[in-house]
Amino acid sequence: MSRQRPVIGVFDSGFGGLTVLREIVRLVPNAEYLYFGDTARLPYGTKSADTVARYALGACHFLEGQGAEHLVIACNTATALAMDAIEAKANVPAIGVVEPGASAAAAISKTRSVAVIGTEATISSHAYHHALERLGINAYEKATPLLVPLVEEGWTDHPVTKQVAEIYLQDAFVRREQRSDVLVLGCTHYPLIRPLLRKVVPSDVAIVDSAESTAKALAKKLGIAPPSASAAGATQAAGARAQMAPSAPEPKEGTPDFRFFVTDSVQKFRRLGSGFLGHPVDNVEHVDLGG
């Protein structure tokens, strides 16, 4: 691998972290990417904090062994339950998705009140609540677990998904002492239903995508300025071409290079992953990290 380009390891329990990878590639195109999806052991939301931390550390050490120089924990549950352990035991810098999402929401909230949706485990951890509280923001947290299987089913613009979202969010933006004026997407599946959620929440409520916020935070850490709109479009096209020809001997300057690792079905990851990443997913390897 070229030492001229950063090698960035991205970890998630499954597919949702690909939305984070998509945003990172848009801002940091000239890099080599290693993505690890622990698909055999998802969902992490049903596991204990100790188990999640053990799985997450195993994934991080695997990515380090593959040459990762920076780690992105592209999983809200792993960030919420294991970030302290990762920061203490990882051998390279690591960034999670909670702090960037909370910071982005705090920066734009005028009412100083923010709503957060996520999986049961993420919400129960109160990770966003604590992060927002440190920034002087009140948090309204709501677990919305049914949205995850609906996204994986491909029902990103389905009436059933819209109805489920409406039921979950019916109390999120009612008039309280401080009405929430920002909605944080605290699950990496949810960017795929952002247009649908835009129809559900009031028009004056801003939506913050933790994937976008995390990508910006990583780019800032790397000292990389955001590309222009035209450059970003060219990067996405280059990424698609790179996926279609993964065996190219040396990626061109500015072209991302990808390797994907999964602990379960390679075929399923290719099929579902393309929807999350936005272009074909290839160069996928099966790995077994054991218990």
Curated annotation (Swiss-Prot):
Region (Disordered): 234-257
Pfam families: Asp_Glu_race (PF01177)
E.C. numbers: 5.1.1.3
Annotated substrate binding sites: D12, S13, Y44, G45, N76, T77, T188, H189
Reaction equation(s) it catalyzes: L-glutamate = D-glutamate
GO molecular function ontology, one term from the record: glutamate racemase activity
GO BP terms in the entry: cell wall organization; peptidoglycan biosynthetic process; regulation of cell shape
Chain intervals with Low complexity compositional bias: 234-247
Active site: C75 (proton donor/acceptor), C187 (proton donor/acceptor)
Keyword match Manganese: no
Enzyme class: isomerase
Entry keyword set: Cell shape, Cell wall biogenesis/degradation, Isomerase, Peptidoglycan synthesis
Pathway(s) it belongs to: Cell wall biogenesis; peptidoglycan biosynthesis
Family: Belongs to the aspartate/glutamate racemases family.
HAMAP family: Glu_racemase
Primary role: Provides the (R)-glutamate required for cell wall biosynthesis.
Protein name per its UniProtKB record: Glutamate racemase
Organism, as annotated: Koribacter versatilis (strain Ellin345)
Name of the coding gene: murI
